[in-house]
C-alpha cells in the first residue's frame, strides 16, 4: 500500500510539474516565449524577452512549483516513516513534469527553478536560500546565467548527498538525486558546449533591471541613439540583427517599437 501511495504521489507531482508559468505569462501578454531567444520557456529567456520583473515573477512561481509537492509529500508521509524518500519521489517527478510535460508534447523547460524549489525542502530552507542568493549574485556580476544555474544544482546536490540518511531508503534517494542532476546537466548540454567555446549568450540582469525601473537611459534617448547609430548596442542586450527588424527611421512616436525589441 505504501508503494501505491508513492506512485500516486509521483503521478500527481509530475502533472503539477506540467504547469509552465513562462508560457502562461507570455500568453497573458499575447505572446509566446518559445518563439523568442533560446526558445526555452524558462526564467533566463523570460529575462531576455520580457525583462527583470517578469523574470523574477516567473522564477518565484517556478520555485513554488517545486516546493509545493515536495513539502506536501514530506508532511503527509512523515507518519509512515517515508518522508525522506517521498520528498525525492515528489521532487524528481515535478522536475520531470517540467522538462517533459505530457500536455506540451514533452517539450518543456530545463528544470532549474523547480529543482531549486525541491532543494528548499530537501535541505534546510536557509541553506538553499544562501546558495540561491550566491548564485544569483554571481550571475549579476558576470552575466553568465548558465554557470549560476548549473552551479546551484551542483552545490545543492553535493550538500544533499552529505545529508541523506542512508538508513531511510537512502540508496533510492541517492539514485533519484543522481538521476535528476544528470538529467538537468544533459538538457543544458548546449549551454555547456557554448561555455567551453566562449559563445554562451549573456544574461545581463543589471541592464534588464535598469530598463524595467528606468534607471538608465530613457526610451526616447535610446530611440534617438538607434536613429543616429543603427548598429549601436544598447544596455548590452540589443544586437544588430534585432535592430534591423525595427523600422524606426522617420517615426517620431517610437516607444512602442523599442518595447518590442527582443533582448538576446
Language-model segments: residues:
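Cytosolic, membrane-interface loops and tails of multi-pass inner-membrane proteins
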Residues: 23-55, 108, 193-216
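Short, non-helical or kinked segments that cap or interrupt transmembrane helices
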Residues: 32-43, 102-116, 144-155
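Interfacial segments of multi-pass membrane proteins
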Residues: 47-50, 73-76, 93, 111-142, ...
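Long, low-complexity, intrinsically disordered cytosolic termini of multi-pass membrane proteins
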Residues: 213-264
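C-terminal ends of transmembrane helices
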Residues: 22-25, 95-107, 134-142, 189-193
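Loop-to-transmembrane alpha-helix initiation sites
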Residues: 127-131, 145-152, 168-180
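Alpha-helical transmembrane segments in multi-pass membrane proteins
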Residues: 9, 13-14, 18, 22, ...
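Helix-coil boundary and interhelical linker segments in multi-pass alpha-helical membrane proteins
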Residues: 1-8, 70-89, 120-127, 161-176
Amino acid at each position: 500500500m505504501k508503494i501505491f501511495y508513492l506512485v500516486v504521489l509521483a503521478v500527481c507531482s509530475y502533472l503539477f510539474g506540467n504547469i509552465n508559468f513562462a508560457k502562461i505569462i507570455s500568453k497573458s501578454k499575447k505572446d509566446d516565449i518559445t518563439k523568442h531567444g533560446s526558445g526555452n520557456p524558462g526564467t533566463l529567456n523570460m529575462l531576455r524577452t520580457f525583462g527583470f520583473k517578469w523574470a523574477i515573477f516567473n522564477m518565484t512561481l517556478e520555485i513554488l512549483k517545486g516546493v509545493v509537492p515536495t513539502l506536501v509529500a514530506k508532511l503527509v508521509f512523515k507518519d509512515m516513516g517515508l518522508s525522506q524518500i517521498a520528498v525525492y519521489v515528489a521532487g524528481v517527478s515535478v522536475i520531470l513534469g517540467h522538462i517533459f510535460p505530457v500536455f506540451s508534447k514533452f517539450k518543456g523547460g530545463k528544470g532549474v527553478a523547480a529543482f531549486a524549489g525541491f532543494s528548499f525542502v530537501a535541505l534546510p530552507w536557509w541553506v538553499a536560500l544562501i546558495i540561491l542568493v550566491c548564485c544569483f549574485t554571481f550571475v549579476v556580476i558576470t552575466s553568465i546565467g548558465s554557470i549560476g544555474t548549473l552551479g546551484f544544482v551542483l552545490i545543492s546536490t553535493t550538500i544533499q548527498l552529505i545529508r541523506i540518511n542512508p538508513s531511510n531508503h537512502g540508496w533510492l534517494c541517492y539514485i533519484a538525486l543522481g538521476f535528476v542532476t544528470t538529467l538537468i546537466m544533459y538538457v543544458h548540454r548546449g549551454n555547456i558546449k557554448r561555455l567551453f567555446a566562449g559563445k554562451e549568450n549573456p544574461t545581463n540582469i543589471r541592464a534588464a533591471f535598469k530598463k524595467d525601473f528606468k534607471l538608465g537611459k530613457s526610451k526616447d534617448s535610446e530611440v534617438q541613439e538607434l536613429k543616429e547609430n543603427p548598429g549601436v548596442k544598447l544596455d548590452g542586450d540589443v544586437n544588430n540583427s534585432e535592430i534591423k527588424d525595427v523600422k524606426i527611421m522617420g517615426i517620431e512616436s517610437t516607444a512602442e517599437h523599442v518595447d518590442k525589441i527582443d533582448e538576446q
